[in-house]
Design a protein with these regions (language model features):
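Hydrophobic residues in beta-strands and at strand termini
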Residues: 31-33, 82, 128
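Residue-level signal for inorganic ion chemistry
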Residues: 52, 96
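Catalytic strand-loop segment that frames the active site of acyl-thioester-processing enzymes
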Residues: 6-50
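Hydrophobic beta-strand-centered segment that forms part of the acyl-chain substrate-binding groove
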Residues: 60-95, 105
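HotDog/MaoC-like acyl-thioester-processing domains
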Residues: 15, 22-26, 88, 97-133
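N-terminal amphipathic/basic-hydrophobic helices that include classical n-h-c signal peptides
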Residues: 1-5
């Protein structure tokens, strides 16, 4: 099996973390997408939207590592759903839930925080092999 290494350079400048709350296994991260995020370059002129890969890698995976500590490279991603467009300037809520067993599973849900109420933008599951002690 070929492993894919996720590189998240320039990610720290891509999203503004406003707050983090929750317990050891469940976290809520509030963040904002800057108007000038590099992720919108070429995606798409006249109607910028955050690419799905940025939602999974730059938001869900990176924030899982920040709040839960170092994780191994992801072994698989499943149940990925992209339900709404994330736009420049959007306020977001990221819910992360970690389950540990034979492998570590992180479930994520990204919601756009709109005046009329939250709307799910994306969700899914990322699996990681457990690090050997």
């Amino acid at each position: 099996m070929r492993r894919v290494r996720i590189v998240s350079r320039h990610v720290s400048e891509a999203f503004e973390i406003e707050s983090t709350s929750g317990s050891d296994e469940q976290r809520i991260v509030r963040l904002r997408v800057p108007l000038s995020s590099r992720f919108f370059e070429g995606h798409f002129d006249g109607m910028p939207m955050l690419p799905g890969v940025a939602q999974v890698v730059a938001i869900a995976h990176r924030e899982a590592e920040r709040v839960f500590g170092p994780l191994s490279a992801p072994t698989r991603m499943s149940r990925l759903k992209f339900q709404d467009v994330i736009k420049p300037g959007d306020a977001l809520s990221l819910s992360l839930t970690r389950e540990r067993g034979a492998e570590t599973i992180v479930r994520f849900r990204i919601e756009r925080l709109l005046a009329e109420g939250p709307r799910v933008a994306s969700s899914g599951t990322i699996a990681y092999t457990n690090r050997e002690s």
